[in-house]
Amino acid sequence: QLSGSSDIYTLRKSDGQTYSDDSTDIWDVTAAKETGSGFDVLLEGSDGTIREGYNFIWSTNSSGVITSGSGWLTDAQTESDANGYENRFGKDFNNDGLISGGSAYQLLGSSDIYTLKDGSGATYSDDSSSLWDATAAKQTGSNFEVLFEGTDGTSKEGYNYIWSTNSSGVMTSGSGWLTDAQTESH
């Protein structure tokens, strides 16, 4: 069942065939997101099967009828910024603690997703600087630590910066730029 803003729809093919968790052992529908013209539906490969580590995205029309599919994608392909599926489904496919593909870095907490911000409310993304990108985040208790890595070929190559945040994803303190060796011992 797909829950839309105005109704609930049954996921089905154009010939009327419907799907449920019992349809196959190799994948399950794990998320659906309403779009302007229907739904995007995420199928995740089941652990221990040939589809483990793979995902498939169906697009449907406004009645829940499948109109197209992505083909099977690896977790890396699914999380790539070009596809934007991490952001679309709010899932961390590569387990780096970040939700990629949106207009700002998002941190995956144990119970919610938080936008990384500075004290004035400004947000950051891969487009914020050509010198660095956030590459990982880790929840520490109710707070986060976010790793920024210097971009290859820039003055920050080989350097890293670790930002600590509060429980809402607001940056509270930073490590300063550390070499790779200093980061390992941090």
Predicted features along the sequence, with ranges:
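Long, low-complexity, Gly/Thr
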Residues: 1-186
